[in-house]
UniProtKB/Swiss-Prot annotation:
Tissue expression summary: Expressed primarily in hematopoietic cells. Coexpressed with EDG6 at the same relative levels in all tissues examined, with the highest levels in adult spleen and lung.
Listed name of the protein: Guanine nucleotide-binding protein subunit alpha-15
Function: Guanine nucleotide-binding proteins (G proteins) are involved as modulators or transducers in various transmembrane signaling systems.
G-alpha domain boundaries: 41-374
Length: 374
């Protein structure tokens, strides 16, 4: 009968072969302990979701809540991006007015629109006064407002109404973006972006990948050693089409992407955190855009944001249930995948703070307990 290498016998009682095996055993144990220590020191969460679901905004919130925030110098660096967002938004509405055959209501609007259209948004370096005056005039035009109400029929940044409502402040020469201005800014994520921060002595690394379809092939090497998957989906996209393909409903595409991700082998035992984002936009548009028009199975009352939220959550929950597999008969080392869902408004710092605290207290505590590190 072979002697156990864990016996407390004296070293001279072991053969050379057993001494070698004992050294190897000790080295393996040392490596395993070091790996556990590293796991404890840094945990990785993968942030996924379709384009414009709010992933980058969520990362910005993590920086504000758990990181260094945005200094005046940091915020100043967002000026050009915010100017670009404003020009892109107004030009999108001017283009849409022509396509949707919506007339201007004010006598000088065409002249102001022509001026705005002469500017390349991606070459803006300052917000010159003539453009600011033109946009303020246009934003008061009933035709532009009617076009905005039909925004589901063309691509328009969610931040359009916010920025256009603050044109006077933003167009000032001394303008320095606020934290809220920064949160509302939009730049498509390309490639892989990571952000590290500490919560209760645990370092978290959130990995954000590009949401556009062309970026998804770059995801694969991010899948290893992920303790939880955060999936962001927009509640307000039920009546919108993809920017890449105007024949596909954005919410249906998001549901399909969610299903695809859940089926990937890397996530079979990874907890899933669903953030149904943009509650504020849903609550605004549900009064004029009926959910049942796009999802006929919705039988709830019209203009009821809570009923709409419940229905959309149920669609995602059913996708999750259809992808969930029974555990492998209690196989040692296997972890049960769990599903957590939260409604969020990624531009609301207090809302995100509260939701992420729930995530930390449930998902992270459970994970650390499973690897015996609590």
């Amino acid at each position: 009968m072979a002697r156990s290498l864990t016996w407390g016998c004296c070293p001279w009682c072991l053969t050379e072969e057993e001494k070698t095996a004992a050294r190897i055993d000790q080295e393996i144990n040392r490596i395993l302990l070091e790996q556990k220590k590293q796991e404890r020191e840094e945990l990785k969460l993968l942030l996924l979701g379709p384009g414009e679901s709010g992933k980058s905004t969520f990362i910005k919130q993590m920086r504000i809540i758990h990181g260094v925030g945005y200094s005046e110098e940091d915020r100043r660096a967002f000026r050009l991006l915010i100017y670009q967002n404003i020009f892109v938004s107004m030009q999108a509405m001017i283009d849409a007015m022509d396509r949707l055959q919506i007339p201007f209501s004010r006598p000088d609007s065409k002249q102001h629109a022509s001026l705005v259209m002469t500017q390349d948004p991606y070459k803006v370096s300052t917000f010159e006064k003539p453009y600011a005056v033109a946009m303020q005039y246009l934003w008061r035009d009933a035709g532009i407002r009617a076009c905005y109400e039909r925004r589901r029929e063309f691509h328009l940044l969610d931040s359009a109404v916010y920025y256009l409502s603050h044109l006077e402040r933003i167009s000032e020469d001394s303008y320095i973006p606020t934290a809220q201005d920064v949160l509302r800014s939009r730049m498509p994520t390309t490639g892989i972006n990571e952000y590290c921060f500490s919560v209760k002595k645990t370092k978290l690394r959130i990995v954000d990948v590009g949401g556009q379809r062309s970026e998804r092939r770059k995801w694969i090497h991010c899948f290893e050693n992920v303790i939880a998957l955060i999936y962001l989906a927009s509640l307000s996209e039920y009546d919108q089409c993809l920017e890449e393909n105007d024949q596909e409903n954005r919410m249906e595409e998001s549901l399909a992407l969610f299903s695809t991700i859940l089926e990937l082998p890397w996530f079979k035992s990874t907890s899933v955190i669903l953030f149904l984002n943009k509650t504020d936009i849903l609550e605004d548009k549900i009064h004029t855009s009926h959910l049942a028009t796009y999802f006929p199975s919705f039988q709830g009352p019209r203009r009821d944001a809570e009923a709409a939220k419940s229905f959309i959550l149920d669609m995602y929950a059913r996708v999750y249930a259809s992808c969930a597999e029974p555990q492998d008969g209690g196989r040692k080392g296997s972890r049960a995948r769990r599903f957590f869902a939260h409604f969020t408004c990624a531009t609301d710092t207090q809302s995100v703070r509260s939701v992420f605290k729930d995530v930390r207290d449930s998902v992270l505590a459970r994970y650390l307990d499973e690897i015996n590190l609590l």
